[in-house]
């Protein structure tokens, strides 16, 4: 089976403190690794203003992860967890070209 490269961008609420944000990022990096993904890069893009309001917030902290995986388990688990996590406003997963 071919290894696929993915990029996940997610937005963290702006009122989350640094310690909680760091724990959240480490947790999601671990979710990817625990589900068969290999982390290539995980970086903070910082706080940015939105073009429109999301859940009564006008800005959020962007974080981007790039990883490889042999199957979609890591992507599916991240998607499931990010939907129920109240610290994440939005997330987007993109399959990158080989």
UniProtKB/Swiss-Prot annotation:
Keywords: Ribonucleoprotein, Ribosomal protein, RNA-binding, rRNA-binding. One of its GO terms (molecular function) is small ribosomal subunit rRNA binding. This is Small ribosomal subunit protein bS6. HAMAP family: Ribosomal_bS6. It comes from Lactobacillus helveticus (strain DPC 4571). Binds together with bS18 to 16S ribosomal RNA. Pfam families: Ribosomal_S6. The keyword Disulfide bond does not apply. GO terms for cellular component: cytoplasm; ribonucleoprotein complex; ribosome.
């Amino acid at each position: 089976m071919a290894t696929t490269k993915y990029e996940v961008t997610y937005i963290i609420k702006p009122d989350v403190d640094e310690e909680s944000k760091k724990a959240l990022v480490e947790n999601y990096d671990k979710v990817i690794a625990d589900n068969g993904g290999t982390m290539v890069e995980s970086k903070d893009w910082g706080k940015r203003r939105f073009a429109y309001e999301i859940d009564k917030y006008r800005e959020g902290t962007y974080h981007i992860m790039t990883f490889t995986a042999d199957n979609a388990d890591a992507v599916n688990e991240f998607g499931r967890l990010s939907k129920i996590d109240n610290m994440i406003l939005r997330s987007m997963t993109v399959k990158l070209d080989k």
